[in-house]
Amino acid sequence: MDPTLLALGALALSGAAATVAGCAEDLESDVGSQSNPNSQVQLGPQMGNIHRYFNKAISGEPVSYGLYVAAAGATAWALMGMNLNPILAIIVGSAVAALVHGAYSVSAFLGRIVGQSKNFGQPVYMDVMMGHLGPIVGHGFIAVFCMLFAAYLAVNALGNPFPLPLVALIFGITVGAIGSSTGDVHYGAEREYQKYAFGGGIPVANQGDIDIMAETGIRNGLDSSYFCSKLGGPLTGLAFGLIIFLDGWRSILGNIIGGDLITKAAIAIVVGLIVVITTLLLNRKIEVYARNKFGPYTDR
């Protein structure tokens, strides 16, 4: 079969895996209130809002997911060096990362909540910890597995010159940054502040005054992930999937059109610049359209 067709197929599969990984990563962070909304949940008890959110301030998402995916990649790489089947190696590596993820989540939750118990009266709800841990580890496993699979395709099918653990580290940092900047805003700036008028942002005076009541009963992280699965999670997956697909596509296009190595690299760089400029222009037009369509925010 034509190597170019094989590369295109591997790229499409890698982009699909990255899309699933991005969605799962964002929903996992929503269950655990990590990154963007974490500081608001942290301030809740200080504002008199005793909550039942799972609050795991391990670190920012880029750092934590860089750790998880790199640990999974290093484990899988070592197992593949021992002639284990690549799929099994990726599964075992993702399982190791899930164990690390779960351990950090429990220690971060208990440490953060216990630190607020004495001064602000925030109880440590053990049922919250046990009920949220499964979705956190499960979504994390899916995200790490898909990212590690995409990294494996990048190294073995798309000709990436770097070793698997390093590519996995880069993918983990990238998806964490996208989840923190794209998907978590849907939770931290909207879901936690639904009692305030939409579009008003989060004034300093309102920080920590989070919603603690759901449509029925008391709100928790599982409610938040359900809400964010409608927009924030899919947007994160779409953003990460497009980054992986377009980045690989420009390299393949350079290999098809170019002759020598320098020409191929130059074509790939030019195509990448065209994609970035086109994206900037589209973002600007969408922003201007939205502002003209819905008008400025007022406090009426």
Swiss-Prot record:
Coiled-coil regions listed: none
Cell compartment(s), UniProt: Cell membrane
Biological process terms in GO annotation: methanogenesis, from carbon dioxide; methylation; one-carbon metabolic process
Protein keywords: Cell membrane, Membrane, Methanogenesis, Methyltransferase, One-carbon metabolism, Transferase, Translocase, Transmembrane, Transmembrane helix
GO cellular component terms, semicolon-separated: cytoplasm; plasma membrane; vesicle membrane
Topology versus the membrane: Multi-pass membrane protein
Reactions accelerated catalytically: 5-methyl-5,6,7,8-tetrahydromethanopterin + coenzyme M + 2 Na(+)(in) = 5,6,7,8-tetrahydromethanopterin + methyl-coenzyme M + 2 Na(+)(out)
Keyword Membrane attached: yes
Translocase found in the keyword field: yes
Matches recorded under Pfam families: MtrE
Involved pathway(s): One-carbon metabolism; methanogenesis from CO(2); methyl-coenzyme M from 5,10-methylene-5,6,7,8-tetrahydromethanopterin: step 2/2
InterPro entries: MeTrfase_E
Transmembrane segments: 62-82, 86-106, 135-155, 158-178, 226-246, 261-281
EC number of the protein: 7.2.1.4
Entry GO MF terms: tetrahydromethanopterin S-methyltransferase activity
Protein function: Part of a complex that catalyzes the formation of methyl-coenzyme M and tetrahydromethanopterin from coenzyme M and methyl-tetrahydromethanopterin. This is an energy-conserving, sodium-ion translocating step.
Subunit structure: The complex is composed of 8 subunits; MtrA, MtrB, MtrC, MtrD, MtrE, MtrF, MtrG and MtrH.
Family classification: Belongs to the MtrE family.
Protein name per UniProt: Tetrahydromethanopterin S-methyltransferase subunit E
